[in-house]
Regions:
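Cysteine-centered motifs
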Residues: 8-11
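Bacterial N-terminal signal peptides that target proteins for export
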Residues: 42-54
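Bacterial N-terminal signal peptides
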Residues: 53-64
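Acidic/polar surface patches and capping/hinge elements
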Residues: 70-552
Length: 552
């Protein structure tokens, strides 16, 4: 027998991703069961093994939740710094179960639970709250979490139907197993691992769901396959590189003073280099994080750079300190697509899951296995795009417009040399519209990581390319209401934004607007958008061609 240490204490992650800890909870297990932490494990054929894995997960969740409740406020400040506060209320309890849901409706129900759990995870907690801020903070971690949840759901359903290749090597089971119970159990188990302090809510939701299904052998088998699917993907993602905590600028991460290099946002002073190590995470399907690394950005002395510079300078100003030629509609577009990690909204993966479900509903995608496959494809493509994008971001370390425009002229910036481009005219007070500090009290901001390529453009490129491949065409009209404009979300002055619905005639129209929105906010260059979309498209094609394929 050997003793394994399961983490709690000063935690940054759930047990599935390996915590950074100050203390541990120890459990003795047999040597045969050490395979839990082995990324090379491909099959789970032992029922006892699965039960041990589930038990270990529960122990880790309980231990972690208790300790993490004491850590949330310092962790909030580690990410947002001293300028931001929120009065936002939790969203986790807004999913009352409706009796009689079929399997497809249950999948939609648990998808909503998952993405709103991520929204709550990005909401700094208030006195009396039982959840903890930031288990899966930021676009990379959020996309990984959603991929894990939706792989588990797909694997559970596919084990029952057996139509597609298994991602984790799960054997097929009795076709009479309850799909409804399989969905609920797989979602529950993975969500508890991803967001351990929210597990009491997930437990209640699972109980309500399972109580709606009469006790039977089919119910028991559905629960079992849901547990197996969750355990399998959690084991595969253990020690995948996501356990590395986010470095703090000036402490764990020293930014460069060189011309063209990324530096901290001088307005918000966000104190982290978010995703600085995310390019080291093992991809889900890609061969490596650098497989589709973007080409270098334009040289600072080039006409291409000057053209992009002039565009964001003209369109991206805040209209107060910096004048702008941006129209009211362009301002709306900039905010509409934002979801910049602010309370309740979460990061872009939540937005793109909402769009996926909207299109699936409008396309009448009601077959539960097909819908589960679509969600697995979308979320895995986004997760791998996130890894690939952040690998390129920190490889090139390219500056944001606020830095590039303020330091364009000779005599500005740390070196005083300027950008060396006679076609650019600097503005040392340039103030972008910025990523909206929705549901926060604090300034709009430039996200705390390098510009090139754009994460939004890359995630969007992955999403819309998967949708094109899945449905076989680009001309899919749809309407969508963003949570940035849902009649509830507040701006950083406490004003409730109106409800706005936007219509798109095709996927490519939405894809382009999503990428362009970042230029309207003044936080990205046009080449960030172009190469971000291209990278996301390439990742999506690779994922679609290599995962969740029909059995031959």
């Amino acid at each position: 027998m050997r003793a394994f240490a399961f983490p709690c204490g000063d935690c940054y992650r759930s047990a599935a991703g390996t915590f950074r800890t100050a203390r541990t909870t120890t459990l003795t297990i047999s040597a045969a069961e050490e395979k839990i932490g082995n990324l090379t494990m491909k099959r789970l054929n032992s029922s006892s093994f699965r039960k041990v894995l589930v038990a270990l997960s529960i122990i880790a969740i309980v231990a972690a939740s208790s300790s993490l409740a004491q850590q949330s406020q310092p962790r909030t400040q580690e990410y947002w710094g001293q300028q931001f506060q929120t009065n936002r209320k939790p969203v986790a309890q807004q999913h009352p179960f409706r009796p009689g849901l079929n399997a497809s409706e249950r999948l939609r129900h648990w998808n909503e639970i998952a993405i709103d759990a991520s929204g709550l995870d990005h909401t700094p907690n208030q006195p009396g709250d039982t959840y903890v801020f930031g288990h899966q903070l930021g676009p990379g971690r959020a996309s990984r979490a959603m991929a894990i949840v939706h792989i588990a759901i797909f694997e559970a359903l596919n084990a029952i139907e057996g139509k597609y290749e298994s991602y984790v090597g799960l054997d097929t089971v009795d076709k009479h197993a309850s799909m409804e119970c399989a969905i609920a159990q797989a979602a529950h188990d993975t969500l508890c691992e991803m967001f351990p302090s929210q597990s009491p809510s997930f437990n209640q939701l699972l109980t309500e769901d399972l109580n709606d299904v009469a006790d039977s052998e089919a119910k028991a088998k559905g629960i079992e396959v849901g547990q197996s699917a969750a355990a399998a993907i959690l084991a595969l993602r253990n020690n995948d590189g996501s356990e590395t905590p986010e470095p703090r600028i000036g402490i764990d991460w020293i930014t460069s003073n060189d011309v063209g290099r990324w530096r901290q946002d001088p307005i918000s002073l966000l104190p982290v280099a978010l995703g600085a190590h995310w390019g080291e995470v093992t991809p889900f399907v890609l061969r490596s994080s650098s497989q589709f690394r973007t080409p270098p950005p334009p040289a600072l002395s080039s006409v291409a750079y000057a053209t992009a510079y002039d565009e964001v300078k003209a369109l991206g100003g805040d209209g107060i300190v910096t004048p702008t030629s941006r129209t009211n509609e362009q301002t709306t577009i900039g905010i509409f697509w934002a979801y910049d990690g602010t309370p309740s909204l979460c990061a872009p993966p939540r937005l793109y899951n909402q769009i996926t479900m909207r299109i699936a509903d409008e396309r009448h995608t009601h077959d539960v296995v097909e819908l589960a496959r679509l969600l697995a494809l979308v979320n895995v493509a986004m997760a791998d795009s996130g890894i690939a994008i952040w690998e390129s971001k920190f490889y090139y370390d390219f500056w944001r417009p606020i830095t590039g425009i303020r330091e364009s002229d000779p005599g500005t910036g740390p070196t005083g040399t300027g950008d060396g481009n006679d076609l650019t005219a600097g503005d040392v007070t340039f103030s972008p519209l910025g990523a909206p500090a929705s549901n926060l009290n604090g300034p709009n901001f430039t996200p705390p990581f390098p510009a090139y390529p754009s994460g939004h453009a890359g995630f969007g490129g992955a999403l819309f390319q998967i949708l094109r491949r899945f449905y076989g065409k680009d001309r899919i009209p749809f309407t969508f209401i963003s949570d940035e404009f849902n009649g509830v979300t507040e701006d950083n002055h406490g004003n409730t934004r109106p409800l706005i619905e936007r219509h798109f005639s095709s996927l490519s129209e939405a894809e382009e607007e999503n990428g362009q929105s970042r230029i309207y906010l003044g936080i990205h260059w046009s080449f960030d958008k172009t190469e971000g979309i291209r990278l996301g498209n390439r990742v999506a094609d690779f994922v679609f061609d290599h995962a969740f394929r029909k059995r031959r």
